[in-house]
A protein has these predicted regions:
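N-terminal intrinsically disordered, cationic/polar leader segments
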Residues: 1-179
Length: 179
């Protein structure tokens, strides 16, 4: 078996949510190619890690403003049927996040994010499931794995949840007629 791996940082210029200031956000990407025989087509996987904010599971949703956020990282691994761009995967993840992560925030942006984090609930389980559903309905993606790593900044904990497409797991993928 021959394995070749290549990792690199990928930057996207984004606008902050309120002040519309430009900032660069870094995402870690990698390609992994594996082949077991010379006549076999290599298996190529692409992965990207996207930082987001999700709701801390111990938050008190019944108290006004009682929700807390946690830093989460979504790691996507995909095997593609055809070209797909890292920006598309980042957009997919951030669309389902409670709040995306920015490298720069003004005080107006911080206030907006804090208010959203304390008033809206979006668990890492919900985010992972929504991303899985999007990937399962994306015809360019042959196989996927979604992992959500969660880090408690005040409570000093870390957790991980994940799912992947499997022919043995019902509803982890959809037939091409359904896409």
């Amino acid at each position: 078996m021959v394995i070749a791996e290549f990792s690199y940082p990928f930057f996207i210029e984004k606008l902050t949510p309120v002040s519309r200031e430009k900032c660069l956000v870094k995402y870690q990407c990698s390609y992994s190619a594996r082949v077991t025989a010379t006549r076999e087509k290599p298996q190529i996987l692409f992965s990207i890690t996207v930082p987001i904010i999700t709701t801390y599971p111990g938050s008190l949703s019944e108290d006004a403003g009682g929700l807390l956020g946690q830093l989460s990282e979504i790691k996507l691994e995909v095997r593609l049927r055809e070209n797909f761009y890292p920006e598309d995967l980042v957009e997919m993840v951030e669309r389902h996040a409670l709040v995306p992560v920015y490298s720069f925030l003004t005080s107006e942006d911080q206030a907006w994010m804090i208010k959203k984090i304390h008033t809206e609930c979006k668990s890492s389980i919900t985010v992972t499931d929504e991303i899985k559903n999007d990937l399962a309905h994306t015809k360019e993606i042959e196989w996927y794995k979604v992992q959500c790593f969660n880090y408690g900044m005040l409570q000093h904990y870390s957790t991980v949840i994940g799912t992947e497409k499997s022919m043995w797991v019902p509803f982890s993928g959809y037939d091409s007629d359904d896409v």
